[in-house]
């Protein structure tokens, strides 16, 4: 009993004593992962019909790897999804599926197919009684890329215009707090749109055309929308990926928020995302950038053992009502490894201003709690993710959080903490920029030990991370 009391006390003090004190990981290969939890099992569905499952978010079992005709998720896929695939002029492939359970207890897979690099795309639905399939064709609900002389008008009754009409890709289906069903979707071309769905049938309510534009247009470089409601803040959070998805494309994850599921959405500076369209330079000024390219190495050459990501993006997110934790699921490439990619899962936290910040390392079972000052004061690797869309890989600089509240080293300023929250006041040129975030212990993915980290966000939508250099 004394030992149990000691363990509980230590857990309360440190927040990192876990059932598995040295977490291990087994990752799956899933591009554009979307999350659904069924019972005690998490499932992710991704492009090429890559599917995996896990009970702890750390050890993933690959269920399926490709959309061949003998796959168990959608057997005989070319015939089963013939209507969608024939419109998109493709075979043996679907992109960015998401599965949601409707009131009839069945599982509805919203998926898309496309002629690569063009807006000739369609979003369809397949349905199954079991989360792992087999799924059967149900409906095609949105088409894009119509050639007027051949296909007639677009979904809104006018000739299709790729500058203002959406590309029917990347469906993200969600319930709002009132139980209404919505689908956000879009990729490049005319921007990101949202449609209201019938919660009983899963089909779009009539008379909406393509729905309402939330962000983008004029071929702006953004895609992979996903909306998550937070009961803690009563906001809806719109996640997006800016940039190109390949290892040279500068893919990065951004977020904006709204009090309404169909917007308008605003970034931390209060800018409306409806105005976010244009070149990469223009759109990079919008949204809170949670993560982009980085490596925790200070070497001038690539250290293949160092922890880092390249083009992380196309995420989904999940709120666990039992634990109160938020998670983000995304694919990422890696420094020096070309187009190789895997699934990753990180924990999200709400800062004092109600904005999400992302933990630097993959989820290892940690729970945020108040840390003693002696585990905070010290030297850190410091990453500033900036706002730009770039293929450059951010590297850390060294800073110190001193016991007198000062920050010294490559950046200077002041820091203070309140419970598990941290505020950094960093001098940048002639101004002081305030970053608000959280402190916690995380399992250092490459060094295999628990370290103190912080993750924080400025009112300009810039994320910074600190990883304590443990002796």
From Swiss-Prot:
Gene Ontology process terms (BP): arabinan catabolic process
Signal peptide, first to last residue: 1-19
Cofactor comment: Binds 1 Ca(2+) ion per subunit.
Hydrolase as UniProt keyword: yes
GO CC term, one of those recorded: extracellular region
Temperature dependence: Optimum temperature is 73 degrees Celsius. It is fully heat-stable (up to 10 hours) and retains activity at temperatures up to 90 degrees Celsius. The enzyme loses its activity only after 90 minutes when incubated at 95 degrees Celsius.
Site entry: Important for substrate recognition: 314
Name of the protein: Extracellular endo-alpha-(1->5)-L-arabinanase
Organism of provenance: Thermotoga petrophila (strain ATCC BAA-488 / DSM 13995 / JCM 10881 / RKU-1)
């Amino acid at each position: 009993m004394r030992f149990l009391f000691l363990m509980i006390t230590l857990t309360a003090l440190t927040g990192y004593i876990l059932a598995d004190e040295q977490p291990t990981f087994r990752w799956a290969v899933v591009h554009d992962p979307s999350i659904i939890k069924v019972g005690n099992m998490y499932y992710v569905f991704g492009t090429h019909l890559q599917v995996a499952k896990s009970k702890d978010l750390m050890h993933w079992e690959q269920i399926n790897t490709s959309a061949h005709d003998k796959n168990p998720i959608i057997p005989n896929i070319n015939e089963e999804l013939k209507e969608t695939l024939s419109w998109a002029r493709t075979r043996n492939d679907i992109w960015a599926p998401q599965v949601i359970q409707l009131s009839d207890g069945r599982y509805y897979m919203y998926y898309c197919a496309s002629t690569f690099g063009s807006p000739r795309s369609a979003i369809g639905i397949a349905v199954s009684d079991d989360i792992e399939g087999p799924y059967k064709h149900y409906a095609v609900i949105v088409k894009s890329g119509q050639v007027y002389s051949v296909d007639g008008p677009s979904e809104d009754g006018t000739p299709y215009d790729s500058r203002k009409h959406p590309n029917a890709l990347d469906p993200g289906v969600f319930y709002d707090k009132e139980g209404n069903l919505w689908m956000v979707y879009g990729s490049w071309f005319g921007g990101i749109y949202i449609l209201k769905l019938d919660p009983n049938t899963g089909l779009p309510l009539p008379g909406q055309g393509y729905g309402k534009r939330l962000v983008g247009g004029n071929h702006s470089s953004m895609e992979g929308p996903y909306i998550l409601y937070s009961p803690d803040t009563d906001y809806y959070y719109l996640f997006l990926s800016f940039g190109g998805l390949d290892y040279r494309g500068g893919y990065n994850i951004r977020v904006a928020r709204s009090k309404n599921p169909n917007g308008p959405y605003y970034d931390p500076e209060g800018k409306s995302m409806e105005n976010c369209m244009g070149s990469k330079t223009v759109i990079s000024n919008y949204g809170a950038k949670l993560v982009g390219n980085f490596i925790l190495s200070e070497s001038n050459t690539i250290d293949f053992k160092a922890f880092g990501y390249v083009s992380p993006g196309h995420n989904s997110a999940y709120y666990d009502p039992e634990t109160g934790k938020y998670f983000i699921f995304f694919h990422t490439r890696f420094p020096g490894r070309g187009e190789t990619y895997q699934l990753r899962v990180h924990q999200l936290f709400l800062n004092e201003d109600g904005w999400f910040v992302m933990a630097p390392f993959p989820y290892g079972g940690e729970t945020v709690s108040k840390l003693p000052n002696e585990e905070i004061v010290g030297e850190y690797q410091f990453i500033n993710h900036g706002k730009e869309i770039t293929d450059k890989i951010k590297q850390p600089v060294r800073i110190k959080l001193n016991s007198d509240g000062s920050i010294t080293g490559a950046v200077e300023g002041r820091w203070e903490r309140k419970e598990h929250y941290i505020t950094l006041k960093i001098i940048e040129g002639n101004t002081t920029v305030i970053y608000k975030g959280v402190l916690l212990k995380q399992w250092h993915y490459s060094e295999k030990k628990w370290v103190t980290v912080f993750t924080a966000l400025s009112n300009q939508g810039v994320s910074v991370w600190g990883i304590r250099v443990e002796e």
